[in-house]
Structure formats: C-alpha cells, structure tokens
C-alpha cells in the first residue's frame, strides 16, 4: 500500500483554500488547455477500452531491441543519470511543479524526445538509445527519469490516451518481501518493477509511484504511439502531437534543456 497523501503534505498545504466559482471558471474555461484536455480525454475513453496494463509484445514489439541492447543502454544512461547533475523535471516544465511541491524532492529528468520533438544534444549523451529512437519514430517521447530516495509521486492521470507508457528500469534496489524501489500503483493495483524488465501500461489510469529505498531509482520512460486507435482518433492524435511540438518550440525548450545539459558530462 502506498503512503497516504497526508503523510507527505504540510498543514499549510492541507489548509489550502478552495477556489471560488469564478476562479474555477477561469481555470477550466474553453480558453484554457484543461478544458480541451478533458474533451479529448472523453473522446479517447469512449473509443479505446483497454486494461491498465498491457502486453509489451503486443503494444510495443520493438521493446525487444531495447532488451537485446540492455547492457549498453544501462551503462551509457547510468553514466549520465548518476552524475548528480540531471535537470529537475519542474525546472524544465513549470506545469510539473506541483509534483515537486508535493514532497519537495526533485524528480530528475533528461528528455530525449517529447511528443515527437527531438533533443539531439541530450540524445548524443546516450548513443545506443539515439540509434534506437532514430529507427522508431513511433516512440514519440523518451526520457531518463531519476527518483531520489523517498520520492513520492502523488496520484494523477496522464493527459493523452493516444500513447502507451513504457518503463524500462535500469537502476532499482530490491527490498524486503519481493518489493523493489520501483513501486507503481496503477488503478488500485501495486506493481514492483525489476531491472531489465519492460512494463507497458496506460498512464491515463489513476496512478502514483514511490521510491522507498535509500538509493536513487533510474528508469527509461517512453511514450509509444498506439496503433489500435480508430482512424479518426489517429488524426486527432497527430494533431495533438503537432500542437505539443509547436508548444515546445515556442517555449524554447531546447535552449532551456541545453542550458541544463551543460552541467552533464559529455562523451
């Protein structure tokens, strides 16, 4: 069972005032991305009925290439991830700040591709993964994720059902009772991931995560385009990805990430 959210919040956070009706209208009106996100989510949920966890061989056959090259990928990635200089997720994307403020533990993140928008300088740090991503454009997002010891990711839902989320653990500690430091709760079920074992799931289900160990936990995160969508949703999905790419360009995400990446070791 995951730690109760109240265990990781401060009294100030628990006393946070409720928003007024006017504030809620402003926050959820049609001029805000949340409004359109919920409409899109409804469209996908009406058309795509699937379990929370799916077979990697069916949803992401190319994951076999990752497993075949696992040792090289792990070695190259951990050289970067365990350097102590990985950018914090909330420093890259302000929208992720609430995930940091939940427990004030920085979630390390090195994006390699974001909804089809490539970060070549970051990919250059992990040559084996760079080669894989070049061969597989249907991997629309890829990132190196580092959870520090004790990190809790509060329950939330992903915004986009047009992709599968794939985890490949690279640095995970085995704990008592067959548990590990890579603990996920998805749709009420707890999973403990092991190093070198891929895991494919739908992150639009309510989920949370925690690292209960005294060591960092390093995982590769991929978003894989779903090929089981009806044709009209395929079009909507590509529009969504195109908008996400434009947004990253307008936010100067490459420049911001490269500034952070200057702290990283180079090959």
Regions found by a protein language model. Give the residues of each.
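Conserved active-site beta-strand-loop modules that form the wall/rim of enzyme catalytic pockets
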Residues: 140-144, 164-169, 180-183, 198
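A short beta-strand-loop-beta hairpin characteristic of the jelly-roll/cupin
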Residues: 170-195
């Amino acid at each position: 069972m995951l730690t109760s959210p109240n265990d990781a919040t401060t009294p100030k956070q628990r006393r946070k005032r409720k928003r007024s009706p006017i504030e809620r209208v402003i926050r959820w009106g049609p001029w805000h991305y949340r409004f359109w996100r919920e409409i899109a989510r409804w469209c996908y949920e009406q058309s795509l009925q699937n379990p929370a966890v799916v077979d990697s061989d069916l949803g992401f056959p190319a994951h076999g290439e990752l497993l075949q090259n696992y040792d090289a990928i792990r070695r190259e990635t951990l050289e970067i991830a365990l350097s102590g200089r990985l950018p914090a997720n909330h420093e890259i994307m302000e929208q992720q700040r609430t995930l940091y403020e939940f427990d004030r533990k920085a979630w390390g993140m090195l994006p390699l591709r974001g909804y089809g928008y490539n970060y070549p300088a970051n990919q250059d740090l992990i040559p084996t993964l760079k080669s894989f991503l070049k061969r597989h454009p249907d991997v629309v997002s890829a990132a190196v994720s580092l959870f520090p010891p004790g990190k809790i990711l509060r329950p939330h839902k992903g915004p986009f059902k047009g992709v599968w989320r794939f985890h490949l653990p690279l640095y995970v500690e085995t704990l008592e009772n067959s548990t590990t430091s890579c603990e996920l709760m998805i749709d009420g079920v707890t999973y403990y991931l092991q190093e070198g074992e891929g895991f494919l799931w739908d992150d639009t289900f309510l989920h949370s995560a925690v690292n209960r160990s005294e060591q960092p936990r390093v995982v590769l995160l991929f978003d894989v385009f779903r090929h089981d969508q009806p044709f009209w949703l395929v079009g909507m999905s590509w529009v969504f990805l195109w908008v996400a790419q434009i947004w990253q360009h307008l936010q100067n995400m490459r420049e911001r990430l490269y500034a952070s990446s200057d702290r990283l070791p180079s090959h």
